[in-house]
Amino acid sequence: YIGTAGWNYEDWIGTFYSAKQSARYNWLSYYSKFFNFVEVNSSFYTFLTPKVIIEWLNILIDNYEFKFSIKLHQSFTHQKSFSKEDVKKVYSILKPLIEENRLSGVLLQLPYSFNFNAQNFDYLRLVCELFLDYNIFVEFRHNSWINEKILNYFNDNKINLAAIDMPLIGDSLPLMLNKNQEIQY
């Protein structure tokens, strides 16, 4: 599978999307002609509803191979303030994707300030354990997380390290793949 982080970008008009669009022009439908995967970014900023997910699935009803990954809401990854109700909201949007075999996984994108220590490792395990029934992809921004303890935990629990390509600044992470995981993200 190959795709991008999101598909709804105004600056893609005229380069990827047609500069002249009819009222029926649908960006997701067009995007799906070139890619078979997308990382949903909007779920980081707002809790999506199952209705939105079902609308996307209806747009792609004939494109059976297309998959979505859902980025966890910032209350899980950046604010550390999620509630039981927030967990239920995430499960509710995953459900239609699972029913249609369209879920690639759940992405935890962690901030640069989230460095490795015992407290943060415990928190990471807590969040991961909520979603162990799904493919989990963890995107670290701080290189302190690349250690044997983490890689063993990931391998033991089939959690996937997301490879990111970003400028090396301070203690940021270099581009790397975990050769022990089945799925590369």
Q: Which ranges hold each PLM region?
A:
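Residues lining hydrophobic/aromatic ligand-binding pockets adjacent to catalytic sites
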Residues: Y1-Y185
